[in-house]
Structure formats: structure tokens, C-alpha cells
Amino acid sequence: VSIESRRSTIPPFYVMDVWKAAAERARTHGDVLSLAAGQPSTPAPAPVLRATKTAIDAELFGYTETFGILALRRAIAGHHHRSYGYPVDPDDVVVTTGSSGAFTLIFLAAFDPGDTVVVARPGYPAYRNTLTALGCRVVELDCRAETRFQPTVAMLEELPRPPKGLIVASPANPTGTMIDPDELAAVAGWCDAHGTLLISDEIYHGITYGGERTASAWETSRSGVVIGSVSKYFSMTGWRLGWMLAPPELRPALQRLASNMTVCPPAISQYAALHAFGDEARTELDAHVHRYAVNRAILLEGLAGLGITDLAPADGAFYAYADIGHLTADSMAWCADVLANTGVALAPGLDFDIVNGHRTIRLSFAGATAEIEAALTRLGDYLRRT
């Protein structure tokens, strides 16, 4: 008799399986170049590291307020005001244990089993898998290159009935595409008119290329939820700190759930992150983005030279999402073979698209430039052999 619950029988996060296989190869061969990791290889900014040492010396290890310390909520509110021009009160801010914690909290606070929540396909698998585990009905919009792999009002109008929730991510994982600001405003308006909770995943804000404006959902509507994180732009993945901007009517439920589930976000991470939003940190972090831009150019040019040319636009984040249908009809097996024969780790598309992901892969360019170049050389040798 299995002791697993039915809700636990969701698909695995395949990227984590790739990481495990890559770590095992690194132990046995020592030659792994990972283009699978969805995390920066750059360090947390210097002011954050200094503040961490100060917090440790001051023994700031105890519980904090459930929604986070007031100083951090003020800093996050100020960050949104500076970045997008809209005012944010510290009471609007809910600090969480990573953006993953924010998503779980808002899913529990806003949706009941059986509720329909709409997501884009391709998209981040944890949306679909977590919602499924919570008993929600997940409807995927088939988003293609024509809409830059982003949902549109026209797609929402074709649904048989308005959903309880809609998740929009811009810049998106895995495609790196950004939703047009006017389209985001239209989507937010549609959600307001139809009683649909808009959840805007904005964790890759700050990492963009080409100068297009990055829009935030709260520029248009305060009835939705904005999700942020220190993981991506701020290079603080393992610190496990995120936040959401939540409307007042959801905060009591969020408070009840968060206080029971996590008590509070990690204290040391909160005191450290206070110093992530200043000018010194931003100068350092923008230099990281410049490095990603260099890596992006090298990777896109290198892939084209290898005959891999069907790519999502990669407006932001640090991913290239490629169609390799001319090379394989099984991206899982192909990625495993590439790792076994070259030491290059890639993310199979099935994580992000359960319909067409058998012919796609995601490549991260967040690593060192030399590693991107070396990985391209190995991939070229592999493709010539096969």
C-alpha cells in the first residue's frame, strides 16, 4: 500500500533531475558545463554580503513579523515606486520564503479545489504542478511565436467561461519573452471585468535586452497580485526570499496561512536584502546584466552556427528556448545523451511544455562567458559526430 497522497503524484521538475545527473557526472568526470541552471553564477552584491556579516555578528537569527520586517517592506515598496512610478505602501508588501513560497501562499489564499486557473504554455512547470497538487484545474493557453509566447485578451475571450485565476510571466521562463505593456494593461482590465485574479510573475524584472520597457501589472490594476524575488536580478537564489504585492482583501488569508506554514521568511536573508536596493548594489547588478547580454549574443550566434535557429526572442531573463525538432523527437533522451557524451547539461523542453516540449530545449546563459563558449564547442563536436 502506497503512503503517498494522490496530490503528490505530480510530474517531477525535470531540471532538478538534470542537475542531479550533472552533479553525478561532475563527481565522476569533472567536466560538466551546465546550461541547465536557472540561476545566476554571479555573487550577491557586496552591500548584501557586508550586511550579512553584520547581521550574523548581531545575532539577528530570531523570528520576525510574518509578512517580513518593516524596513524591508519599505525598501521593496520604494523599489517598485522608483522602477515603475506607482506608489506602494509597505502594508501592500508580503515578504515570503522565495517566490515559490509566494506562489504557494497566493494559490492557497485565492483558489479552492476545482477552481480553474489559466497559464501559458510553454511556461514554468511549478505553476501547473503546484496548482494540480492543490486540486485546481489548470488550463494551458497554447502560446506561440505569433504572440511572443505570451497570453492575449483574444485567447482569454475564447475560453468557455472566465477562470478564477490567470498567471502571466514577463520576462518569461523558459522563453525569455516579454508581454507588450499595452497587452498587459488589456489583460489586467479583462481580469478586472471578469472577476479573474491576475497573478503577475515579475521575478526576472531588471534582466532585459534591447531597451523595451518592462511593465508591471500594478501600473494598471491593484486588484491583482505581483510576485517578485531577490533570486534572479539580485543574484540571491539560495537566500530564499521573495515578495508579493497583494490587495487588502487577500491579506488576512495570507496572514493566516503564512503564520501557520512558515511563521516568517528567513531572518538573516531579510536583514541582508535590505541592502540590495541601493545605488551601490544596483551598479554591481547592472554589470551582471551586461555580462548576461554578452553571453546571450555569443550563445545565439553560436546556436545559429550549429543550425539551431528556431528560437524564442529572449527579450529578458537569461534563457534561450530552442526548437530542435530537426535533431530529435525526444528532448529528454537527447539531453541525457548530450550530457553523457559531452558533459554539457541542458534542460529538456518537457518541463515547460507537455505537448510540444519533446522537440524543445532551454539553455541558460547565466554562467561564465568562457563556459558558454566551451559548451558551444562541445555541442558542435557532438552534432558533427551524430
Predicted segments with their positions:
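N-terminal small-domain helix-loop-helix segment of the aminotransferase-like
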Residues: 3-98, 105, 276-279, 298, ...
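Conserved core segment of the aminotransferase class I/II
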Residues: 222-290, 300-302, 382-384
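Conserved glycine-rich beta-strand-loop-beta hairpin in the small C-terminal domain of fold type I
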Residues: 274, 290-300, 311-324
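Conserved PLP-anchoring active-site segment centered on the Schiff-base-forming lysine
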Residues: 109-131
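Active-site phosphate-binding strand-loop segment of PLP-dependent enzymes
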Residues: 139, 143-212
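Short acidic capping loops at alpha-helix termini that bridge into adjacent secondary structure
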Residues: 87-93, 113-116, 222-223
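Helix C-cap/helix->beta junction micro-motif
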Residues: 25-29, 134, 193-194, 342, ...
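PLP-dependent enzyme catalytic core of the Aspartate aminotransferase-like
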Residues: 337-346, 352-386
